[in-house]
Each structure stands twice: as structure tokens, then as C-alpha cells.
Amino acid sequence: MFNSVNLGNFCSPSRKERGADFGERGSCTSNLYLPSCTYYVPEFSTVSSFLPQAPSRQISYPYSAQVPPVREVSYGLEPSGKWHHRNSYSSCYAAADELMHRECLPPSTVTEILMKNEGSYGGHHHPSAPHAAPAGFYSSVNKNSVLPQAFDRFFDNAYCGGGDAPAEPPCSGKGEAKGEPEAPPASGLASRAEAGAEAEAEEENTNPSSSGSSHSATKEPAKGAAPNAPRTRKKRCPYSKFQIRELEREFFFNVYINKEKRLQLSRMLNLTDRQVKIWFQNRRMKEKKLSRDRLQYFSGNPLL
């Protein structure tokens, strides 16, 4: 009934045909990236290393001489020229050895030096310690054990007369200077007491009718006031004519002055605010007294 149909036309091309077709196209595009291709992994083991083990020319670094070597010595065993912690006994012993070699001191004095400096390293220092050390030790060892030797002269000036050395002349001079002024006040007090006694004698002569109780009462304050300094009255500072004229002019217009005007006057007259305030208070009291005197004079009434 049906004509025979060649199914090969409807089927996909065979594997051989596809391979031939792919080979033709692959020759054209051999240098293109194909997803189905595997990646090439080179073998670097066969290639020689870039830096040989024994280079023919040594590379010199310019900063190699400036880099300090690695410190393998402990901190306590370093030479005593460096600054150390105050509780490191190893530095104390190193300092003693260096001093012994420098000053050529016998071994017996080294123990004295260690005992002398034990307080400065251990923290238990007594200025009046009986241990003695040779004079050469103080010439080479710092007096402060922290700062360099150049700072010893400052410690000599600051702590004069302290510890082992005798008192220096500047300190003794200061003590003498302090002790000398103490004598004049005694003589001055004596003269003041004599002057007070003379004044009391004059009062007795002028007032013979005064009772004994009042005399003793006046004598006790005199004795108590003798040791104290005499009360000197504050020196009066009179105002100049220009200041008085300006103050009187302001008082003529305003008997009571406000704060702003008071500050203005104090700046203009080179006075303090308190001086202007007190002057106006005194001037008001004076004006009150003058007005009362005028009223008494014109009225003829003495009771006013």
C-alpha cells in the first residue's frame, strides 16, 4: 500500500559523517577556544629553577650595615654604661666590676661599694649609713644613678650638705643669713616694751586718781601687745585737685551715684570702684553734717 521510504534521509547523519564535517571545521578554527577541549597543563618540574642554588654574583643590600645584629644577651648582663632598672642587681655587680677595673680598687673595697649602693638599687636608702667608700668611687659614679654624670652638679646644688659630704658653704651661709635677722627683732621688742613702760609711767603721772583695777587692765593689754608687731596706720592717699573737682561736680548733680556712673568715674580718674564709692559716702555724711550746722545756726536752736 505504501511506497517504501528510505528512512536514512530522515535520520541524522552518521557518526563518521559528523566526524568528517567536524574535522573540516576544526581545521579552520583550530586556534579558537572550544569548550569540549581539555586544558593543557605544562610540566614545570622539567624546567630549571629561576634562581640557582649558588648564584654567581652576590647581591649586596645598602642597608645591611645599618641593621643591628640580633640581641642574644639578656638585659641584665649588658655593660653598666646603659641605664638600668633600679631593682636589677646584675647591673649593680657589673658596675662594681667595671669600677674595680677602672679605679684599680682592691677586692675588699668592692664589697663596701656594693653595700654602699645596695640602698640605691634595692630601694632602702638611709642617708646616715655607716658604710664608707673610697674617694675615687664618688668621682666616677653618678650621684643619682639614673641621669648621666653631667647632671651631678645640679644634685650637688640641690642637696648640699646631705648624706656623706659635709655641709657646703652656700647652705651654711643661708643658715647664717637666716639666723642673723632674728637678733634685731628681739632688740626691737625690748625697745618697744621700754617705750610702753615709759608711756604707762607718764599716764600714771598725769592721771594719779585712776584706780588700781583700771591701771592693771590697761597694763595687761600693753604686755600682750608687746610681742606682736605694732599696728601701723595705713597711709592716707589724698586725691588730686582734678579728681576732687570731678567728684564734686558729679556730687552736685547726683548725690547718689549708680554703678555705671561710678565705673565711668573710676576709669576716668584712675581710681578704684571702692574709692569712688567711699568718697561719695563720706561726702554725703559731710553734707548732712553741714546742713545740720546751717539749720542750727539760722534757727538758733542748740538742740538740733
UniProtKB/Swiss-Prot annotation:
Write down the DNA-binding region ranges.
232-291
Record-level GO cellular component terms: cytosol; nucleoplasm
Gene Ontology molecular-function annotations:
DNA-binding transcription activator activity, RNA polymerase II-specific; RNA polymerase II cis-regulatory region sequence-specific DNA binding
The keyword Magnesium belongs to this UniProt entry's keyword annotation: no
Query: Which keywords label this protein?
Result: Developmental protein, DNA-binding, Homeobox, Isopeptide bond, Nucleus, Transcription, Transcription regulation, Ubl conjugation
Subcellular localization, as worded in the UniProt entry: Nucleus
The record, for SMART domains, names: HOX
Q: Where is this cross-link: Glycyl lysine isopeptide (Lys-Gly) (interchain with G-Cter in SUMO2)?
A: 82, 116, 178
What is one process in the GO biological process aspect for this record? embryonic skeletal joint morphogenesis
Matches recorded under InterPro entries: DUF3528 (IPR021918), HD (IPR001356), HD_metazoa (IPR020479), Homeobox_CS (IPR017970), Homeodomain-like_sf (IPR009057)
Q: Taking the first listed entry, what is the main subcellular location of this protein, grouped into a coarse class?
A: nucleus
Per the UniProt entry, the disulfide pairs are: none
- Which residue ranges are recorded for the region named Disordered? 167-237
Q: What does this protein do?
A: Sequence-specific transcription factor which is part of a developmental regulatory system that provides cells with specific positional identities on the anterior-posterior axis.
**Which PANTHER family has this protein been placed in?**
HOMEOBOX PROTEIN HOX-A11-RELATED, HOMEOBOX PROTEIN HOX-C11
Q: Which family does it belong to?
A: Belongs to the Abd-B homeobox family.
The entry's protein name is Homeobox protein Hox-C11
Native source species = Mus musculus (Mouse)
